[in-house]
């Protein structure tokens, strides 16, 4: 029983840290975009995230954990292997004005939300459905 429990705990621990679909898994061989302790290889820290960006045919309006254990963003509108982990300053900002329900909003709103104010991450929420709490 103890041996089975020990094997399960080892398996569970490995599973938590195993990243099956790395962010840069579709890159050409010989091109290094692996992160180092200082951040992604050969990328200055001051480069800004580009929103929205397309990764694997999906449009992202904010930092994502798609294919990663930690939030990241692309440095290009179409992901081509240039990326960085998101710091607090990197997350997408509200876009004003934005359209919601055919109406223009200049500030965060509680309309459509039960408790908290929110804003759109694109000029047209009705089209993109991208939002965050304010």
UniProtKB/Swiss-Prot annotation:
<dbReference type="InterPro" id="IPR013806">
    <property type="entry name" value="Kringle-like"/>
</dbReference>
<dbReference type="GO" id="GO:0005615">
    <property type="term" value="C:extracellular space"/>
</dbReference>
<feature type="domain" description="Fibronectin type-II 2">
    <location>
        <begin position="89"/>
        <end position="134"/>
    </location>
</feature>
<comment type="subunit">
    <text>Homodimer.</text>
</comment>
<feature type="domain" description="Fibronectin type-II 1">
    <location>
        <begin position="44"/>
        <end position="88"/>
    </location>
</feature>
<feature type="disulfide bond">
    <location>
        <begin position="63"/>
        <end position="86"/>
    </location>
</feature>
<dbReference type="GO" id="GO:0008201">
    <property type="term" value="F:heparin binding"/>
</dbReference>
<dbReference type="InterPro" id="IPR051666">
    <property type="entry name" value="SP_Capacitation_Regulator"/>
</dbReference>
<keyword id="KW-1015">Disulfide bond</keyword>
<dbReference type="InterPro" id="IPR016356">
    <property type="entry name" value="Seminal_plasma_PDC-109-like"/>
</dbReference>
<keyword id="KW-0677">Repeat</keyword>
<comment type="similarity">
    <text>Belongs to the seminal plasma protein family.</text>
</comment>
<feature type="glycosylation site" description="O-linked (GalNAc...) threonine">
    <location>
        <position position="36"/>
    </location>
</feature>
<dbReference type="GO" id="GO:1902492">
    <property type="term" value="P:positive regulation of sperm capacitation"/>
</dbReference>
<feature type="disulfide bond">
    <location>
        <begin position="108"/>
        <end position="134"/>
    </location>
</feature>
<dbReference type="Pfam" id="PF00040">
    <property type="entry name" value="fn2"/>
</dbReference>
<feature type="disulfide bond">
    <location>
        <begin position="94"/>
        <end position="119"/>
    </location>
</feature>
<dbReference type="InterPro" id="IPR000562">
    <property type="entry name" value="FN_type2_dom"/>
</dbReference>
<keyword id="KW-0732">Signal</keyword>
<dbReference type="GO" id="GO:0007338">
    <property type="term" value="P:single fertilization"/>
</dbReference>
<dbReference type="GO" id="GO:0048240">
    <property type="term" value="P:sperm capacitation"/>
</dbReference>
<dbReference type="InterPro" id="IPR036943">
    <property type="entry name" value="FN_type2_sf"/>
</dbReference>
<dbReference type="GO" id="GO:0033700">
    <property type="term" value="P:phospholipid efflux"/>
</dbReference>
<feature type="disulfide bond">
    <location>
        <begin position="49"/>
        <end position="73"/>
    </location>
</feature>
<keyword id="KW-0964">Secreted</keyword>
<comment type="function">
    <text>Could enhance the fertilizing capacity of bull spermatozoa upon interaction with heparin-like glycosaminoglycans present in the female genital tract. Exhibits both simulatory and inhibitory actions on the release of pituitary gonadotropins.</text>
</comment>
<protein>
    <recommendedName>
        <fullName>Seminal plasma protein PDC-109</fullName>
    </recommendedName>
</protein>
<feature type="signal peptide">
    <location>
        <begin position="1"/>
        <end position="25"/>
    </location>
</feature>
<keyword id="KW-0325">Glycoprotein</keyword>
<keyword id="KW-0278">Fertilization</keyword>
<dbReference type="GO" id="GO:0009986">
    <property type="term" value="C:cell surface"/>
</dbReference>
């Amino acid at each position: 029983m103890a041996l089975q429990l020990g094997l399960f705990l080892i398996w569970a621990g490995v599973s938590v840290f195993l990243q099956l679909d790395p962010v840069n898994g579709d890159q050409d061989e010989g091109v290094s975009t692996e992160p180092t302790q200082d951040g992604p290889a050969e990328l200055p820290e001051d480069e800004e995230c580009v929103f929205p960006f397309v990764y694997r045919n999906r449009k992202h309006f904010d930092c994502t954990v798609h294919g990663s254990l930690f939030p990241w963003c692309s440095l290009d509108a179409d992901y081509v292997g240039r990326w960085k982990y998101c710091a607090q300053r990197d997350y997408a900002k509200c876009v004003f004005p934005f359209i919601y329900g055919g109406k223009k909003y200049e500030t965060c709103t509680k309309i459509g939300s039960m408790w908290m104010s929110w804003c759109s991450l694109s000029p047209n929420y009705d089209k993109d459905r991208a939002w965050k709490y304010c």
